[in-house]
Amino acid sequence: MTSSFFTDVIKTIDNEYASLADDGISAGDVSSFIDTGSYIFNALLSGSINGGLPSNKITALAGESSTGKTFFTLSIIKNFLETNKDAGVFYFESESAVSKQMFAERGIDTKRVMIIPVATVQQFRQQSLVVLDNYLKLDQKDRKPMMFVLDSLGMLSTTKEIEDSEAGKETRDMTRAQVVKAIFRVLTLKLGKADVPLIVTNHTYDVVGAYMPTKEMGGGSGLKYAASTIVYLSKAKEKDGTDVVGNLIRCETKKSRFTRENKKISTRLFYDERGLDKYYGCLLYTSPSPRDGLLSRMPSSA
């Protein structure tokens, strides 16, 4: 078929996301990666120490309570804002777990972070889409780098759950998983079109009755399908003498469209403004052979 026929079809179907593959796929192609502030974590996410978070995809950080998901995210935000002087972050917050002091102590420019409290998945959907639609209305040359954060998906309620609680009903909301899936179906294309990354924190739980000890991410299958990368976090304390100064975070890719799945690394996260240790873990996985790259030397859980 001729390219002119394809062009005519694109005009006819009136789909803003349609394009010839040869011209690039606006919502699918990754134009750049965002440095996380840790070389080893960059390699885990993208296969390169100079990579990091894909600039237009959803990345999920999951773990049990107090594994450092929020602190980990704050460290990525800090590095993103320092690298991009005109950038901004929209932080959708459902846990009431962050404060201005927490941002300031970690060296984050609080004037470039907007905190948006959200209570339900519907509220998150509506407000995030409003921000994206306004961003897409700008001329491309006027769009400054932007990042979305949802902290956390697991704490979001639903409109039905709140209405049932107010009415004194104790019934479980069986629609939540479907609502979450619907939200990410809409957001995935919008984020790709706008070239905006979304970091989602979520909780994990032990699967009852599993043959082997197994962790599962909460919230249904919506995030599992929508996220390009899902990383499970666990931690051990990092001490300076007797003082706990941070955590050693073990990261495992449960899903990845850019690197191998089930790879594991460890990185160091300080509680203060240092955040993620840029060089921690690199020496262990550095290979003397050019054919045996850093990623291939990472241990696998498989």
List each language-model region with its residue ranges.
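Interfaces that engage single-stranded nucleic acids at replication/repair/recombination sites
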Residues: T7, K11, R291, A302
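Conserved small/polar residues in nucleotide/adenosyl-binding loops
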Residues: Y285-D292
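The Walker A/P-loop phosphate-binding site
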Residues: T2-R112, S128-D133
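Phosphate-binding/switch region of NTP-binding enzymes
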Residues: D173-C282
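Active-site phosphate-binding and catalytic loops of NTP-dependent enzymes
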Residues: N50-G51, K137-L138, K235-G241
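Conserved inter-motif catalytic segment of the P-loop NTP-binding fold
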Residues: S26, E64, S75-I76, F80-A182, ...
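Hydrophobic alpha-helical segments, chiefly the membrane-spanning helices
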Residues: S296-S301
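Residue-level signature of catalytic and energy-coupling elements of molecular machines
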Residues: F41, F103, D151, N202, ...
